[in-house]
Amino acid sequence: IYGMNSANGAVIVTTKKGATGKPRITLNANVGITSPTNVPEMANARQYMTMRNEAEINAGRPAYITKDELTKWQQGAPGYESVDLYDAVFNKHATQFQTTLSLEGGTDKVSYYGSFGYATDNSLLKNNALTYDKYTFRSNVSLKITKDLTASINLGGRYDTTNRPWFPFYDIFKSTRVNPPTTSIYANDNPDYYNNFSYVPNPAAMIDADYTGSAKERNKNLQTQFALEYNIPYVKGLKVKGTFIYDYNNYGYKATRKGFKTYTYGEYTGEYTAADA
């Protein structure tokens, strides 16, 4: 770190370089599991309807539902089951995988180091609705041209992609918190018709990229460094070094928003009525 507290301070990062010796191949792999540290537990349908009724009565208004209906919600009768929206959309755990393959070695004239890496993260959303993939490479070569002149070539690159639903992660999570636990995912439990929710869109529809749309982010990064270092003869410790650096960065974003409908089911008509989401 040079001049960290100054306006033009710089942080110098040195990447791994090859060492003299026979070629060595190394493979590293890591698998990880991620899970939320804490997810607030929401009221179930029985608790929600009980509190909703009490709130109306305490405000001097008629009960929200009749006693018979409340009993059905409390007992979880057919058609009155509690719906866990978070469980319908999110997995309890997500997996991560990372691997790196490297090769290094060298002689008294040439040393080299190269690596290729891959990492993936499936996130917590069900149906692989959100995925992240990253590819990296690194190549460092040092060549002793003469006794006093050394050349080095350092290359590094990264390519990563994120595929996700059109709806942002926060909106999906919010939908599982805001909507009541009394509305089922599908109208009349028919998977061909996403149920219409009163507050924010149906979270199960939100993660269905084929139904509501998707977004893709792409990052490309290339770092190159070419250097020549010359030791001044007869002056111990005095060196001259020239460096050429070229960096390339490219970011791409593509989103497709599909018009979609959610539905309500008429118990008496047996018909599904569409509502624009």
Each model region followed by its residue ranges:
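N-terminal catalytic cores of large hydrolase enzymes
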Residues: 190, 201-203, 218
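Residues embedded in well-ordered regular secondary structure
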Residues: 9-10, 17-128
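Active-site-adjacent bridging/hinge elements
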Residues: 74-79, 111-117, 194-204, 274-277
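Short structured motifs
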Residues: 98-100, 210, 225-227
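Transmembrane beta-barrel strand/turn architecture of Gram-negative outer membrane proteins
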Residues: 6-34, 109-187, 213-259
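A surface-exposed, glycine/aromatic-enriched loop/edge motif typical of exported proteins
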Residues: 37-67, 158-198, 250-277
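Extracytoplasmic loops and strand-loop junctions of Gram-negative outer membrane beta-barrel proteins
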Residues: 81-87, 121-124, 203-213, 277
